[in-house]
Amino acid sequence: MFLRRLSIQWKITLLAGLCLLGVVALLVGLSVYRMQHSSVLVKSASTQMLDESARLRLEARGELQALRIQRYFMDAFQYGKGFSRQILFLRDQAQKRFLDAYDLREDLTRQVRTALAANPEVLGLYVVFEPNALDGKDELFVDQPALGSNDKGRFSLYWAQATPGQLESESMIESELADTSSGPSGAAYNAWYTCPKESGQPCVLDPYFDKVGERQLLMTSIAFPLELDGKVIGVMGLDINLSNLQALSEQGNRELYDGVGQVGILSPAGLFAGNSRDAGLLGKNLAKADPQHAGELLQLLAAGKSRLFNENDDLKVLQPLQPIPGAKPWGVLLEVPKSALLGPALALERQLDDMRREGTWVELGLGLGAAVLGLLVLWLSARGVTRPILGVAHMLRDIASGEGDLTQRLPHTGRDELGELAGWFNRFLDKLQPIIRDVKVSVRDARSTADQSAAISSQTSAGMQQQFREIDQVATASHEMTATAQDVARSAAQAADAARGADQATRDGLALIDRTTQSIDSLAANLTSAMGQVEQLASSSEEIGSVLEVIRAIAEQTNLLALNAAIEAARAGDAGRGFAVVADEVRNLARRTQDSVEQIRGVIEGLQQGTRDVVDAMHGSHRQAQGSVEQVDEAVAALQRIGEAVTVINDMNLQIASAAEEQSSVAEEINRNVAAIRDVTESLSSQAEESAQVSQSLNRLANHQQGLMEQFKA
């Protein structure tokens, strides 16, 4: 519908423009799609590459942190290994030189102290020999801690260094050496001694807190077996402070993406020796910090395998390390948010998105410019094509606006489609001009005949309408009279029915009142009987009260007799003790009987009061029942009078209904006759109106046709 209103020029421009816009949109869309697809591929490849690089970097950081920790342990290991060889050398030299046992123990004590003082980073050094394994003379040095001997004379020296330069020594008693109670890691308390002794290899203990001086420090022990001819004769160990490991974890976290992650150091049992995020977890199990992955991490740690985990928004790396040769693996646990780890990849993605959006807008602008330029060229081309058609249209408009002048002709000089159109249009006018001339003469004759027919039809229609209005008034009056007669008959019949219903209701009311009277009489008789029974119950309650009074008196007398018996039994001494017990029981029974009598008395008094209330209520009900009987008798008399009046009304309604029915039948007959006459008159009036309308329409058409013909100039 919209295209029909457009000119040919605009139709050509619109359709060709839509095709051009479709092609431009397709090309731009395809280009944008390819660019976006390429951007996605580039982002995916670059993100994957940067992600892999970040993972490798994180693993490298884990290895670097593991090497730092391993170097820290290896420094202590090398120191302890050298000192253990020195102790064995001192023992060997003492035997070769036949050095006195006292001097040997004194020399060992001095050497341990000197070694500890020379290494302030070590918290303590200890040397423990098997019984009589040092010099075979333990029994000579019982309870001599100054020479490193314990309560059995066994050499078990421990030097502690709470602060650098402040050294204290003690000898470890046998109960400490034999203490196998479990520590936080699950290992025995004396694992520092039993582990190297039983394995024959150096051991690193799990982290534990111990009091050094006045401070609670997290520490671990590296213990070395003292072997002679393949047999372990003692243990030498050193305690190292693990606060340095906490410092290493914090330093590693600062170096790892500006401290946004976490570095943890784990022992073989899963205890934290360092935690950069929460120092409160030191010495505690991994299960408290990460219960979900603790089991898997500890299994990997025990197997010495590294692993990289993806967990929600974080990336975790477990890097195992061997603190000393032959020891169980420890581990470094690195945790970094993916947002920090993949920061370069995300920045590259944002840069690619910006470039893609910029390219999209450039392509859209170029496409839109090309489309506008193409539409302009199409519009100019369509204008050149439609200009001759507009010339022919202007000529036809001049002919149409020149009062239907059929004498004009279109000039045509060309031999194209437009010239052929003008030639055939001129030939059409040559045939139409004489026909229009003859039609104009015929129209003038038809108009005069139509004027005469319209005048006659108007007069006939007016007369029929006057007759129809008068008959319609008669029919309306007859119909109203019939309706009134029918209403009177219906009202009389309804009144008769209502009177019969009232009469029946009166009879039903009398029967109901009669039954009610009988029920009230029966109720009054029952109340009279019940009153006698309740009064008898009240008298029985009073008799029960007198019986209870007798029981109470007997109970009091029994109580007095039991009291006298108890007094006599007391006078009789041991001979009357049994009788005193019986008298006491009798007195208790008498007191309980007396209490029960008082309770029963209270119940009986309540029952008597209730009985008196019931008697009063029943007297009132009896009086109300007698009053109700008198009111019912009065209602019966009133209903009988109503019934007599309803009977008279019913007879009169029947006579009125009969007369109204006869009047209604006569009125209906008259109404039918008048309605038939009205219908015939209405039909004639309608036909007369239709005839007048046809004549008027014919007259209007003749006038219109003459007006149309007058527009043509033939």
Curated annotation (Swiss-Prot):
HAMP domain segment(s): 383-437
PROSITE patterns: CHEMOTAXIS_TRANSDUC_2, HAMP
Description of the deletion phenotype: The pctABC-tlpQ deletion mutant is devoid of histamine chemotaxis over the entire concentration range (50 nM to 50 mM). Deletion of the gene significantly reduces chemotaxis to AI-2.
Domain of life: Bacteria
InterPro entries to which the protein is assigned, alphabetical: HAMP_dom, MCPsignal_dom
Gene Ontology biological process: chemotaxis; signal transduction
CDD domains named in the record: HAMP (cd06225), MCP_signal (cd11386), PDC1_MCP_like (cd12913)
Alphabetized Pfam families for the sequence: HAMP (PF00672), MCP-like_PDC_1 (PF22673), MCPsignal (PF00015)
Spans through the membrane: 12-32, 360-380
Membrane topology type: Multi-pass membrane protein
UniProt entry tagged with the keyword Iron-sulfur: no
SMART domains named among the record's database cross-references: HAMP (SM00304), MA (SM00283)
Record domain Cache: where: 50-290
One GO CC term, this protein: plasma membrane
Annotated Methyl-accepting transducer domain residues: 442-678
Keyword annotations: Cell membrane, Chemotaxis, Membrane, Methylation, Transducer, Transmembrane, Transmembrane helix
The keyword GTP-binding is annotated on this UniProt entry: no
Subcellular localization: Cell membrane
Main location: membrane
Binding residues annotated for histamine, in chain numbering: 170, 208-210, 239
Main function: Chemotactic-signal transducers respond to changes in the concentration of attractants and repellents in the environment, transduce a signal from the outside to the inside of the cell, and facilitate sensory adaptation through the variation of the level of methylation. TlpQ is a chemoreceptor that binds and mediates chemotaxis to histamine, a key biological signaling molecule. It binds histamine with high affinity, which permits responses to very low histamine concentrations.
Description of how the protein assembles with itself and partners: Homotetramer.
Family: Belongs to the methyl-accepting chemotaxis (MCP) protein family.
Name of the protein in question: Methyl-accepting chemotaxis protein TlpQ
Organism: Pseudomonas aeruginosa (strain ATCC 15692 / DSM 22644 / CIP 104116 / JCM 14847 / LMG 12228 / 1C / PRS 101 / PAO1)
